[in-house]
From Swiss-Prot:
This is Regulator of G-protein signaling 7-binding protein. Signal peptide: none annotated. InterPro entries: RGS7BP/RGS9BP. Interacts with 'R7' family proteins RGS6, RGS7, RGS9 and RGS11. Component of some R7-Gbeta5 complex composed of some R7 protein (RGS6, RGS7, RGS9 or RGS11), Gbeta5 (GNB5) and RGS7BP. It is a lipid-anchor. Residues 27-36 have a biased composition (Basic and acidic residues). One of its GO terms (cellular component) is neuron projection. The keyword Chaperone does not apply. Palmitoylated. Undergoes rapid palmitoylation turnover. Palmitoylation regulates the cell membrane and nuclear shuttling and the regulation of GPCR signaling. Upon depalmitoylation, it is targeted from the plasma membrane into the nucleus. GPCR signaling inhibits depalmitoylation and promotes localization to the plasma membrane. Its main location: nucleus. The gene is rgs7bp. It comes from Xenopus laevis. GO terms for biological process: G protein-coupled receptor signaling pathway; negative regulation of signal transduction.
């Protein structure tokens, strides 16, 4: 009985030991497989993240353009419009910087082959930055003209309009000044000047980012012009037509 009991006690211990040994050997293999799968998915996830950033930046550029068109509209409150422009402009600059950082990290070597999607994102980001700086310049011009109009309407030497409101309990009239305050006009002009300076600062930052984007662009994109990048009229076809045209002129002149 004692030997049988000892055998019953020893067998589960051996089986448990063998089970633990098998499980320890299987865990590193599972970790290696999981690590290889994650490493394979990381570039694709980064590419999708860059694509989302460029698309969001494109949306911000479109929203900013719509606000620039509304500058000077009498039906739009100018302070609230300028506040919304500042908000979208700041958010757009942050998105552009973030998109450039992510795109530069996955572009790879300059002289090697790059993914076509990366080339498309580079071109799209470059076009968005060019349009963004152009719209900033437009907003500066429109805000400058708006500031000039406000200075022209500043009531510094204008006549003061006074209403006489007699009070029922007194015969002395109450003077009520209904003219606009020069301080308010000066405050508005100062706010517009501040918005112009902030827009100019952001425009310089985006121009520097555009120059940096062109410098860090992969070599296959640097060696091509805009027409070849957008698959427009091929250069050899245009050159061949010019040769035929010149030959025809020489034939007529002779």
């Amino acid at each position: 009985m004692s030997s049988a009991l000892n055998g019953r006690k020893n067998r589960p211990r051996d089986s448990q030991g063998s089970r633990f040994q098998i499980s320890h050997k299987a865990l590193p293999r599972d970790c290696e497989r999981k690590g290889s799968a994650d490493s394979a998915l990381t570039p694709q996830r980064t590419l999708e993240h860059c694509k989302m950033l460029v698309q969001d930046f494109n949306t911000q550029v479109a929203l900013f353009r719509e606000l620039v068109i509304s500058i000077g509209d009498v039906s739009v409150n100018c302070p609230s419009l300028r506040a919304e422009m500042h908000k979208i402009r700041t958010k757009g600059c942050e998105m552009a910087l973030h998109a450039h950082q992510k795109l530069s990290a996955i572009s790879g070597p300059e002289d090697g082959e790059i993914h076509p999607e990366i080339c498309r994102l580079y071109i799209q980001l470059q076009c968005c930055l060019e349009m963004y700086t152009t719209e900033m310049l437009k907003s500066m011009c429109l805000l400058g003209s708006l500031q000039h109009q406000q200075k022209g309407k500043e009531p510094c030497v204008g006549p003061r309009i006074i209403d006489y409101k007699p009070e029922e309990s007194s015969d002395i009239p109450i003077l009520d000044d209904t003219s606009s305050s020069p301080t308010d006009m000066q405050q508005q002009c100062w706010q517009v000047s501040t918005d112009i300076e902030n827009t100019e600062r952001d425009m310089r930052e985006m121009k520097n980012l555009l120059s940096k984007l062109r410098e860090t662009m992969p070599l296959p994109l640097k060696n091509q012009d805009d027409s070849s990048l957008l698959n427009l009229t091929p250069y050899p076809l245009v050159r061949r037509r010019k040769k035929r045209f010149f030959g025809l002129c020489c034939l007529i002149s002779s």
